[in-house]
Regions:
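Hydrophobic membrane-targeting and insertion signals
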Residues: 1-50, 220-236
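Short secondary-structure junctions
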Residues: 28-36, 116-121, 188-194
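N-terminal beta-strand/beta-hairpin edge segment
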Residues: 35-118, 122, 127, 131-135
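Solvent-exposed coil/turn segments that connect beta secondary-structure elements
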Residues: 43, 63-65, 80-82, 141-143, ...
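A short, surface-exposed beta-strand/turn
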Residues: 75-85, 149-154, 223-236
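Soluble extracytoplasmic domains of inner/organellar membrane proteins
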Residues: 102-176, 180-184
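Extracytoplasmic/luminal low-complexity segments enriched in Pro/Gly and acidic/polar residues
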Residues: 173-236
Length: 236
C-alpha cells in the first residue's frame, strides 16, 4: 500500500510539473516566438504549489533562435512569487520577473540583413563588438556604421554613432529609423510591464537586462489572437 501511495504521489508530481511547465513555456513561446524550456525550484513540490495556486520560483530559457523578428536573441527569465487567482480582468499576480536578453554578433548581422534589407550592405562583412567603448561596428564592402546599444522607450535601441556610406544616399536619420523599427519590434511593448533596465556590449554581442515587479497577469480577452499581452499569458 505504501509503495502504491508513493507511486501515485510521484506520478501526480510529474504530471503536474509537466502541465505547469507546458503552460509557462507556451506563454513565453507565444510572446517571444521561440521555443522555451522551463524548470522549477527543487522545493516545495510543484504539486503542492499547484494545489495552492502559488509558484515560488520558475526559470525559463529560450532556444536562442530569435526574439520576435530579431535573430540570434536568447532570453533567460527568473520568475518569482506567482499567485494565481481568477477575477474578471486578472489571472493573478507575479511578484517579480528578472530577465536577460543576449544578442549575438552574428544574430545582429542576420537580423539587419533579414529584417532591414535596405541596410544589408552595411553588414556584408563582420560585426565587431567593442566592450571598451560600448559600441558595435557594422562593416560592409564600402559602407560601415558604428552603433551604440542604449535603452530607449523601455526597450533596446541601436543608436547610430557614425556612418560611412560611400556612394550611398542614405543618411544617419534614415539608418536610425530602420534600426529603431527592428529593435522596437523585438524588445518593446512586452506584457506585464516588462521593461529594459540596462544594456552592455560584450565580447560576443549585446546583453540587456529586463524586469517587472508586482505585475498583474491579464485575463483572456476572448477575441484577440497570439502575440498580445491579453492572450499569451492568459492561460497560465
Amino acid at each position: 500500500v505504501v509503495l502504491v501511495l508513493v507511486a501515485v504521489a510521484i506520478g501526480a508530481e510529474l504530471y503536474t510539473r509537466h502541465l505547469a511547465s507546458s503552460k509557462v513555456a507556451s506563454a513565453v513561446q507565444c510572446e517571444i516566438q521561440d521555443s522555451a524550456s522551463v524548470s522549477f525550484a527543487p522545493s516545495p513540490p510543484v504539486l503542492w504549489q499547484y494545489l495552492n495556486s502559488h509558484y515560488t520560483d520558475i526559470s525559463v530559457q529560450t532556444a536562442g533562435n530569435q526574439v520576435r523578428s530579431a535573430k540570434g536573441m536568447k532570453v533567460n527569465l527568473d520568475i518569482r512569487d506567482i499567485k494565481l487567482s481568477d477575477t474578471s480582468n486578472s489571472r493573478g499576480t507575479i511578484g517579480s520577473l528578472n530577465g536577460t536578453i543576449t544578442w549575438s554578433a552574428d544574430g545582429i548581422k542576420q537580423s539587419i540583413q533579414d529584417a532591414v534589407p535596405v541596410l544589408g550592405k552595411f553588414v556584408t562583412g563582420e560585426v565587431t563588438t567593442n566592450p571598451g567603448d560600448g559600441t558595435v561596428q557594422l562593416k560592409g564592402l564600402l559602407d560601415s556604421a558604428t552603433v551604440k546599444p542604449q535603452i530607449v522607450n523601455n526597450g533596446l535601441s541601436l543608436q547610430v554613432v557614425s556612418l560611412s556610406a560611400l556612394g550611398s544616399k542614405m543618411s544617419t536619420t534614415s539608418v536610425q529609423q530602420h534600426l529603431d523599427e527592428l529593435t522596437s519590434k523585438a524588445t518593446q511593448n512586452y506584457p506585464l510591464g516588462i521593461h529594459a533596465d540596462s544594456v552592455k556590449v560584450t565580447s560576443t554581442g549585446v546583453e540587456a537586462t529586463f524586469s517587472t515587479s508586482n505585475a498583474t497577469i491579464p485575463a483572456d480577452s476572448g477575441g484577440s489572437t497570439g502575440g498580445s499581452q491579453d492572450t499569451c499569458f492568459s492561460n497560465v
